[in-house]
Structures are given as structure tokens and as C-alpha cells.
Amino acid sequence: SPEKFLEPKFEPEIFFKLRKKPHSEMSDVDLISCCESFGIGVELVQSIYEGWIFKLPDTVAGFGLHGQYKILEETEIPSDENNRVAIIDELKNFNLTLRKNNNILERGRSSNILEKSPLAALRSYIEFCEKNSDWLVLNGPITTGTITDAYDINKDDVFSLELDCLFKKRFIVKF
């Protein structure tokens, strides 16, 4: 329910779940082999700063503006290397169409995440954890950043998102 958040916004995000500790110098195939699964979800972000007017350091004080993350679909990483390579390629090249109340808001793409892909965000997280090992999360979702801009959520809004690969179906989120 959006009412329990402060000026909530909607963001689609890819996530990974690590099953073993990776290192930042691994190839993409080795890195994804450390994951038990990946998936698509949505994050509700919020701002304690009225009108979403703040400076970058304020996001730390606002706990990264995180509200809640909801997993929409999760897929196990296959054991076959050819299938892993195919997933890596799709993670680097997907497009996502985001709609609100049947109106297209934006067409996002994988390269919107750190100007590269969700794997680049996962690798950046691993680099951070190599210096801050207490932050490493195993068996829990590691989100990779929004694929589109964040959009306002109001009561009774219906969002849908559709990817051209990875998960070939439309996901509906109702408020």
C-alpha cells in the first residue's frame, strides 16, 4: 500500500542471489556461477525530503531512500555454461517497457544500470564488499539499480513491465 510510504515512487530492478563468495576479477561466467538465481522485481522508494529535493549526501541520511522491494519472478542460474553465457548476453542487452495505467512511461534498457548492465552493478557491489566484508549478502536479493526513472505511485495505480528477453511476459503490480 503506497499510503505507508513518504512520496513513494516505483522502480523496476534486476536482482541476484549469491550462493558463494565471488571476487571482482572473475569473468562474467564465473561471476554468475556464484549466483544461485536472478530475477526481476520492483522497489518502492521514498523520500523524507519534500518534493524529492535533496543532495546526494542526503540519500545516506535517508537510508538510500529504500522503502520496500518485491520480487516478481526469480530464475535459477543453470549449471550448463552455454545457458549461462546466453543469460549474460540477455542481461547486457535487454529492453523493458514500463506502463502506468496502460500508458507507456518509459522504455528502459540494461545499459541504464551504471551505463553498462546489472552484472556491472553486481561486480561493483562485490568490489565494495571486498573492502567491507560485513556487507556481503549470501542467499538474499542484491538489487542492481533501477532500469528506468522512478515514477510516482498513487492509490489504485496499476503498473506493468515487460522485458523483451529474460522473462518474456508482462508483470502487473496494482496499488
Predicted feature residues:
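Catalytic-core "active-site belt" of small-molecule-metabolizing enzymes
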Residues: 1-117, 122-123, 150-160, 168-175
